[in-house]
């Protein structure tokens, strides 16, 4: 590849081909730049290993594709931290892809190719067979025809043994919020301005309706409680894209599995790691009741009804090979993990719908202490193997630690660009780690690192932690 990244090459036909998707999606405002750590190869590999399924072989290279890549933050960070991979990002909004190309060019990322196309046009491209195909959130924002074209892309371009990550708004967790979404979408149609302004106008009307005693709104968890909290941490563009998409529709797990079974895909597990362990999220009586349901898809549906699941991160495969319990154990012990926070801030407990899972013991503390000096393979930590596995999986489920790559790569240039693009008006809080992931940093911490501002006491341990992480251990 030449010194000029393929991410810079603009095809004038792309804008026209992408525009065919526009009426079925919010396109007048750009979505906020986001990083999805669940889409990392190491994270998806761990999900496969938990299910005793062989992850893709990556030693000699691999291919990864994101459908609905937005402004390319996830794709760029993954490409930069996995130089042996061939990365592709596809999004039907030309503005998103233009931003993604600028980010990749400025960061010097040469193994990322970006396409401003809808899924139907992308399916016809001459692309590699992908070991990983990821689609974060988009599956429940698009209509049935667009979901079909997404599946056609997967069917055509998934490599043998490849993994597919699809996350989506799920039922029945959204059931109480359906009237809220329907009403905000309907009210927004008569408002003026762009989608952000339309959502704001619709929300203002709904606040007056709620105050007057509109039961369908006041019984909505999103409207009654969550929306105000979300406004403090999410971009206004999020609300426009989340709630004003014409085809917005939360899906039952059985609907998604049935659609993907039509192209030969079967469920592997959940990228929400704790959801792979009934003992973490279900009470004993719930586990007993579910045990009576033999069909795995119906069992998962009943489980979602128990938990009122509202978001799923499902991993699928067509033909990934099963592995023995012995191989699974060995590969899990060989997995490299990284700490996601300073050691002093770690909480050795995880609240779940089934109660609080506690792992405040010597083995968990040993794992965290070892990882405080940088990423390590689990086998490098002293302790009984079975205890190490059990506690590492609890720590990973609580996102105290993450599965990462064992080989560190330089990320200074990428982080310098991310820092330059990070402004108060348009926050970009993510900073890459050399081990193949990125962390979202607190605003005050980013100001301290950039400008030397006083650091709040709650963040005192972070600069040293990040310095060690940046050094790759």
What feature does the model see in each segment?
Residues 4-125, 172-179, 471-473:
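N-terminal charged/capping segments associated with class I S-adenosyl-L-methionine
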Residues 124-132:
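A short acidic, Gly/Pro-enriched loop at the edge of an enzyme's catalytic core
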Residues 131-145:
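A short SAM/SAH-binding and catalytic strip from SAM-dependent methyltransferases
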Residues 148-160:
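A short glycine-rich, Lys/Arg-flanked "PGG" loop and its adjoining helix->strand segment in the class I
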Residues 166-193, 209-215:
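Conserved class I S-adenosyl-L-methionine
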Residues 199-227, 235:
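Glycine- and hydrophobic-rich flexible loops that cap the catalytic core of alpha/beta enzyme folds
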Residues 231, 235-373:
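C-terminal lobe and adjacent flexible extensions of AdoMet/dcAdoMet transferase-like proteins
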Residues 278-292, 298-312, 316, 356-473:
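Long, charge-rich, low-complexity alpha-helical segments
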């Amino acid at each position: 590849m030449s010194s000029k990244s393929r991410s810079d090459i603009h095809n004038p036909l792309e804008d026209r081909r992408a525009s065919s998707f526009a009426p079925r999606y919010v396109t007048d405002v750009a979505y906020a730049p986001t990083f999805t750590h669940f889409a990392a190869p190491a994270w998806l590999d761990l999900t496969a290993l938990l299910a005793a399924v062989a992850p893709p072989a990556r030693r000699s290279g691999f291919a990864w594709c994101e459908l609905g890549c937005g402004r390319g933050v996830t794709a760029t960070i993954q490409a930069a931290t996995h130089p042996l991979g061939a990365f592709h990002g596809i999004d039907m909004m030309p503005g998103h892809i233009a931003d993604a190309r600028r980010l990749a060019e400025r960061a010097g990322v040469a193994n990322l190719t970006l396409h401003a196309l809808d899924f139907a046009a992308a399916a016809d491209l001459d692309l590699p067979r992908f070991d990983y195909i990821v689609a974060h959130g988009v599956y429940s924002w698009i209509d049935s025809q667009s979901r079909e074209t997404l599946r056609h892309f997967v069917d055509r371009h998934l490599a043998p043994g490849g993994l597919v990550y699809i996350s989506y708004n799920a039922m029945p967790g959204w059931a109480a919020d359906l009237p809220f979404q329907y009403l905000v979408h309907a009210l927004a149609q008569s408002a003026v301005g762009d989608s952000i302004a339309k959502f704001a106008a619709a929300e203002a009307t709904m606040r007056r309706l709620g105050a007057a005693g509109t039961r369908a709104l006041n019984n909505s968890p999103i409207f009654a409680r969550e929306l105000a909290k979300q406004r403090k941490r999410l971009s206004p563009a999020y609300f426009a894209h989340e709630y004003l998409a014409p085809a917005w529709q939360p899906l039952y797990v059985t609907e998604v599995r049935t659609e993907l079974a039509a192209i030969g895909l079967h469920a592997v597990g959940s990228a929400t790691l704790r959801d792979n362990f009934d003992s973490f999220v279900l009470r004993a009586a719930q586990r007993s009741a579910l045990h009576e349901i033999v069909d795995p898809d119906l069992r998962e549906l009943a489980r979602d009804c128990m938990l009122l699941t509202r978001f799923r991160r499902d991993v699928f495969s067509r033909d990934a090979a099963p592995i023995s319990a012995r191989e699974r154990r060995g590969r899990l012990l060989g997995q490299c993990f990284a700490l996601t926070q300073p050691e002093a801030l770690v909480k050795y407990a995880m609240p779940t719908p089934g109660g609080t899972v506690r792992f405040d013991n010597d083995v968990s503390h040993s794992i965290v202490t070892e990882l405080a000096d940088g990423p390590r393979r689990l086998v490098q930590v002293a302790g009984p193997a079975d205890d190490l596995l059990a506690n590492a999986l609890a720590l990973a489920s609580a996102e105290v630690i993450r599965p990462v790559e064992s080989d560190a790569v330089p990320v200074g240039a990428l982080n310098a660009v991310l820092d330059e693009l990070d402004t108060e008006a348009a926050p970009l809080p993510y900073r890459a780690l050399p081990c193949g992931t990125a962390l979202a940093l607190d605003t005050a911490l980013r100001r301290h690192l950039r400008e030397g501002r006083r650091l709040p006491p709650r963040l005192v341990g972070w600069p040293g932690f990040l310095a060690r992480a940046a050094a790759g251990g």
